[in-house]
Amino acid sequence: MAAKTVQYDNIYLNLSEKPGKLRIAPSGLGWKSPSLAEPFTLPISEIRRFCWSRFARGYELKIILKSKDPVSLDGFSQEDLDDLINVIKQNFDMGIEQKEFSIKGWNWGEANFLGSELVFDVNSRPAFEIPISAVTNTNLSGKNEVALEFSTTDDKQIPSAQVDELVEMRLYVPGTTAKEDAADGEEVEQNAANLFYESLKERADIGQAAGDAIVSFSEILLLTPRGRYDIDMYETCMRLRGKTYDYKVEYSSINSLFLLPKPDEQHVVFVIGLEPPLRQGQTRYPFLVTQFVRDEDMEVDLNIEETVLKEKYADKVKASYDQPAFEVVSQIFRGLTGRKVTTPAEFLSHEGHAAVKCSYKANEGQLYCLDKSFLFIPKPTLLMNTSDITRVTLSRVGMSVSAARTFDLTFTLRSGTSYQFSNINRVEQSALVAFLESKQIKIHNDLADETQQTLLTSALDDEDEEGDEEMEEALSEDEDFQAESESDVAEEYDENAESSDEEGASGAEGSE
């Protein structure tokens, strides 16, 4: 039979939101949607085989490629199968493998790596398939448990209420398995979870992290999450490799960079903001906090060809660096990610530092007053944009103001969330208030209210003491006062009563 061109309408490409038209021709196939400017084309030279199965929107024609991720075309009806078999046979001289997915609902089976996919089989039928390129991170979360983290959509036009995404999966891999030893060629027993983890990690590097790293940094100290990591930086992503955890971070997920000197004058921190955050089990890390010794130098050469450096990274990065380590790392991050590095604003503490020491709950740290935000480090790292702050309250709880050497600072955001930072030295109050006023942030000073209340209470106490003394004086008996005799009382009420003087005189006369 002669080859022919066939068109199918309302077909979705790789779970696209809107459908398009699929055209199958002798040279390959193409897909075009009104919502996209450029069509998707696939030449016959890249196609390995075709698969047919039940899918999200009816039936799917899955195309397995020789060197890339599989292509999913769904939206077909069951009646389209016979026509597709004939067209693909005529144009490509290939058949269509019909697959039935397991619908038993079992949560145990076999995990196999097939090309660029991880396939979970139940009774020799696939239960689900995961493109390895979608795995951004994998970690051993237990002796026999492997955690897989997946990339999330970056389409911010889709309302969050309409987006349900798989972000993490955990697989329990029990027992041991045999692995050939590269040294002597003999098979050795190895923990099955470890082998699965190493295999997945190796395959997950295929894709955007493929090729040689542009630059690598060794033994970089991270305060959050705690540990030392090797950082490999590629064209569009970086990898953090630690003793326990490995992470892959897309540059597109880096939303902020901060370079901040610590008050101890010996260290400098470089903070990397992430969205979505890094995950370790149930713990999320929206910020990576790295720390460098101020006097430590670093010398590196970038693995970039001179022509590429001039064309793609002109005025962004240099071919080589030999300067303080914190400057080298921050400048390379700025050049490769395209993000601005935020440094301290004009704020200076009482001791001339860019931050004030304080505590958030039970954690001690530093609060930086930046041009457009306030940042608390290291743990937990909290960022409060100036535009989101409704008011700041100064207070001192649990101690009289006159005796307090520290005070608390509470930030209230438009969302209703509040953050209280305590144990701030009293000498920092004037500088903080002046900075808040310069940013036109509403300030509620409970310290002044408490001071006035203390003075009023003290005045009332003094008045009470004076009143008590007057009352005591009124009620107490005069020491110079002597009570009169009963005769004095009689003289006052009885005119015939003899006075004591008369009695004394008559007595004297009688004696004479």
UniProtKB/Swiss-Prot annotation:
Localisation per UniProt entry: Nucleus; Chromosome
UniProt keyword annotation of Nucleus present: yes
Effect of gene knockout: Sensitive to methyl methanesulfonate (DNA damaging agent).
Entry GO MF terms: DNA binding; H2A-H2B histone complex chaperone activity; histone binding; nucleosome binding
InterPro entries: PH-like_dom_sf, RTT106/SPT16-like_middle_dom, RTT106/SSRP1_HistChap/FACT, SSRP1-like_PH1, SSRP1/POB3, SSRP1/POB3_N, SSRP1_DD, SSRP1_sf
Keywords assigned by UniProt, alphabetized: Chromosome, DNA damage, DNA repair, DNA replication, Nucleus, Transcription, Transcription regulation
Family statement drawn from the similarity comment of this UniProt entry: Belongs to the SSRP1 family.
Miscellaneous remark of the record: In contrast to the orthologous protein in animals and plants, this protein does not contain a HMG box DNA-binding domain. This function may instead be provided by the HMG box of the associated nhp6 protein in the FACT complex of fungi.
Protein name in UniProt: FACT complex subunit pob3
Name of the coding gene: pob3
